[in-house]
């Protein structure tokens, strides 16, 4: 009888613990190891480009807005670091400022080239903003040549470390 009670208790414990385990992780956008979706980019001349046009190259995609000091600083730092140290890596900066003039004046004050700057015309109301869950904070992504996210929320220091490891391999 002791063994029957013990077995029943063990079975009930297993069933309850199996039911209590979450099957899905909470999602906050796209993560390293996942393929980044195609993003339609609009530049200052309102010309459309696609992120997939850059396949075969390493790309840093940076989401930012002039009203967010942290994302604006990251935009300047990443742009300058890549321009000076890794010009072969594409830098795509996507602004979510609802007023494009604000973004353009911010770029001028920050002395950034317009060639790698893009605008999300619907700002924070856009599907892109929602898909990447940017309400929780602006992010940036390092994308490899195959369109796979290699790292996210990177700094110039992180890039330096990543590229040092890659060059030593």
Kindly give the residue locations of the regions a language model identified.
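Short, internal strand/loop/helix patches
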Residues: 108-145
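Short active-site neighborhood of thiol/selenol oxidoreductases, capturing the structured segment around
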Residues: 50-72
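Hydrophobic beta-strand anchors of alpha/beta hydrolase catalytic cores
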Residues: 60-61, 91, 140
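Bacterial Sec-dependent N-terminal signal peptides
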Residues: 1-27, 169
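Thiol-/selenol-based redox modules, centered on thioredoxin-like
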Residues: 136-169
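N-terminal "domain-start" segment that seeds a small globular fold
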Residues: 22-51, 164, 168
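Structural microenvironment flanking redox-active thiols in thiol-disulfide oxidoreductases
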Residues: 72-110, 124-129
């Amino acid at each position: 009888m002791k063994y029957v009670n013990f077995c029943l208790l063990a079975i009930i414990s297993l069933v309850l613990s199996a039911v209590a385990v979450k099957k899905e992780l909470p999602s906050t956008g796209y993560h390293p190891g996942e393929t980044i979706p195609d993003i339609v980019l609009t530049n200052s001349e309102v010309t459309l480009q696609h992120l997939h046009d850059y396949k075969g190259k390493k790309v840093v995609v940076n989401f930012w807005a002039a009203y967010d000091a942290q994302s604006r600083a990251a935009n300047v730092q990443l742009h300058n670091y890549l321009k000076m140290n890794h010009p072969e890596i594409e830098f795509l900066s996507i602004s979510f400022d609802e007023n494009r003039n604000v973004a353009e004046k911010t770029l001028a004050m920050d002395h950034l080239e317009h060639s790698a700057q893009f605008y999300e015309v619907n700002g924070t109301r856009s599907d892109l903003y929602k898909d990447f869950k940017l309400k929780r904070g602006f992010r940036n992504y390092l994308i490899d040549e195959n369109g796979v996210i290699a790292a996210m929320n990177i700094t110039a220091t992180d890039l330096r470390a990543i590229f040092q490891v890659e060059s030593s391999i």
